Each structure stands twice: as C-alpha cells, then as structure tokens.
C-alpha cells in the first residue's frame, strides 16, 4: 500500500526571520509582460502537420514571396508545422535586446526537432507588436517510429525553445518614473509584515516616509529625479525586514500523496469515520496539581488530547496526550491507508471545524 509522504514544517518566530525587501515584495509598475504569436516551423524531417490551417498558412507564406500555386494543387508538406509562440518581456526591456521564445506545436506534428522558425511577430495583450522572433529550435524530447507502425516518445518533442530567439522592438510604458511616491506590494499579503516594512523604512529615513495602505501595499515617498530614484530604490530593496509567521496551513498534493503541515496546526476534539477507519480525537482534563502558593495552592486543570484509530481489522492505536495532526497522519499510515483516505479524513476534520488551519489541495 502506498504510504503518504509527510513533511512537517517548523517556522521560526517572525522576530528572527529577516528577509530582503526585494525577496518579499515587488515595486508597483515594475512587471513582466506576456507575449504571444503564431508562426511556421520548417525543415522538419517528415514530422510536420497535415492540418488544413497549416496548409493555408504555408500557401500564404509562399504568396508573400511571389510564389503562386495553380488552382487545385495541394500544398501539403510534412516538413512544415504550425506553432504558437510565447515569450516573457522583462520590465524595462529596450529595443534590440534579446529574449527567449517557447515554440509549441498546434497541429498534429509528431516532432519539432531540427526545425527553424520563420520570421514571426510577438504581440502583447493590446495587440501591438513588441518583438520579432526567428531561429533554430532546441527540442529536448525524442520520438521514434518503427517499421511496423509502432511509435515511442520520450519527454515532449512537440515543444522547443529558441534561446535569445526574439528581438525586442517596442518599449512597454512604465509608471516607475512618474509621481513622487513608490508602492511596494507584498508577494504574500500580511498585515504584520506590512507593518514591519513600514517601520523599517521609517526608522531608516524618518517618520512618515512610508505608509501602510493595506495588508499588501506600502507607499513610500521617493525623489522625482530618475537617477536618484534608482539609487533610492536600491537602498530600500536591500533592507532586511522581519517577516511574520505564516498562517496555519496544510497543503495536500492529491497526485503525489504529499502532505505538508505547518507548525501552528491544532486539532480539536472530534470523531470521523471513513471507510474502514475510525478516528477519534478526545480531550481529557486531568488534575495536574497545586501551584505551590502560600495560601495552600490552587488546583490547575490542563486539557490533554488522545487519538484512537480503529480499522475494521480490530487494531486500535491509542496515542499519548498532546495529539497533533502529525500523529493522525502517521497513525493512518501505519494501518496501510491509501493517500485518498488520509486526504478525506483531513477534509472531514476541516469541515467539522476540528482543524484551525487552511487546507489547500493542489
């Protein structure tokens, strides 16, 4: 029986978690942009398309070079493939700079190995052309056909890359050099971390320089001169900021069976039955003793928890006081439960309010 891979994460207190500001936040207006396009890959060794739109694109390409085919002539070529193009345009990219291009087959081509992308445009979401792509593909996948019609494929031979295959042709407008403020946006919104960033900047530059807008954004006064602004931002993004602890969270990967449990996950008394398994979490209030005061002492009652897991086979597992979610997962593993059983139990406990953590299934 496949066992669950369990990882328990223990986070340090936020007072000792110092991160650079550039690692936990980004500057508003400084961002990448996605580009897309359509093109033809030629030079394939019989592994191209046989689709109608590829033939139409091929005929259109020939006509641009002054080649006109007679009516009724089929322009099908197994050495040509229609492809989609994607690329990421970094912030502040300037005309003439190079970016990588990812090329993916659209039709029924079996492989793009050895192909060359013809000159194609890359557009942004606004429809404007921002880059021009062309070049030889680097394909990591491998495909092979046997004489009897058999076929084997390794990795993905229908997707390739062209390193530095596109030339930037247009600048994306940016608000970085406008106004007299900068705004930092945290990658993971958190009120405590936002306050820590604000306090750190104000302690360095003076009161009122930074203002917390919400759990994500911190607005900072900045010089208008572009060169001074770059120096100013360089200082700020290298500040060490104390990062708050994350919320209690359980992450479950339903495909691999991996469960990641944060440090602050608590389990309350509950009982759940799933298939052949019964999980019982109970709280027992034992008497601990006296506090040792002069007045004779006061009885202190401290709650403790225990877990029982009973499969139909008659086995029962009783745990020491101080039950944790880690104990539950390990116990269910011991009776040979499938990954789906553990995930169903966790989801049931979450719905019943017995787990005070976010349950994230990926």
UniProtKB/Swiss-Prot annotation:
Protein location: Periplasm; Bacterial flagellum basal body
Keywords: Bacterial flagellum, Periplasm, Signal
Pfam families in alphabetical order: FlgI
Oligomer and partners: The basal body constitutes a major portion of the flagellar organelle and consists of four rings (L,P,S, and M) mounted on a central rod.
Species this protein is from: Marinomonas sp. (strain MWYL1)
Family according to the record: Belongs to the FlgI family.
Protein name according to UniProt: Flagellar P-ring protein
GO molecular function: structural molecule activity
GO cellular component, one term: outer membrane-bounded periplasmic space
UniProt xrefs under InterPro entries: Flag_FlgI
Tagged with keyword Thylakoid: no
GO biological process, one term: bacterial-type flagellum-dependent cell motility
Functional description taken from the UniProt entry: Assembles around the rod to form the L-ring and probably protects the motor/basal body from shearing forces during rotation.
Signal peptide: 1-18
